């Protein structure tokens, strides 16, 4: 019976530890180096050139975060190049409404692939900002 409790405790610990490392972040600058490993001594793998691009943090080591993007590219980025601002990229064209209801005034058409900043969300609606539009 002790082995069963130990196994359950072990499983719970590693499940919550793994999920704690996974968070969503955005790129802070319009030019961010992605490296092969968690340090400046590792060579640059590729360079992002999009500010606010959403990425998912999947691991961390000291001041570096391992990230993965929407196209499943992954690598290591220094924490100074990341921020905790939520952003999204819609997969299809969307309509931006002035209020959180389908009956409110549409104020813009959002093209797929555009980076949108998320200000806050309820169960069904998110308040977003893109360029000069907000809704």
Model features per residue range: what roles?
Residues 5-15:
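Bacterial N-terminal signal peptides
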Residues 18-36, 46-51, 58-132:
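SH3-family beta-barrel domains
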């Amino acid at each position: 019976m002790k082995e069963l409790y130990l196994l359950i405790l072990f499983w719970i610990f590693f499940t919550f530890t793994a999920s704690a490392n996974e968070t969503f972040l955005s790129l802070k600058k319009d030019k961010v180096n992605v490296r092969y490993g968690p340090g400046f001594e590792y060579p640059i793998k590729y360079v992002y050139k999009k500010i606010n691009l959403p990425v998912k943090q999947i691991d961390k080591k000291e001041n570096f975060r391992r990230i993965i993007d929407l196209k499943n590219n992954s690598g290591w980025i220094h924490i100074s190049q990341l921020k905790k601002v939520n952003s999204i990229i819609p997969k299809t064209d969307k309509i931006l409404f002035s209020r959180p209801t389908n009956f409110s005034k549409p104020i813009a058409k959002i093209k797929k692939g555009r980076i949108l900043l998320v200000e806050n969300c309820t169960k069904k609606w998110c308040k977003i900002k893109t360029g000069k539009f907000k809704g």
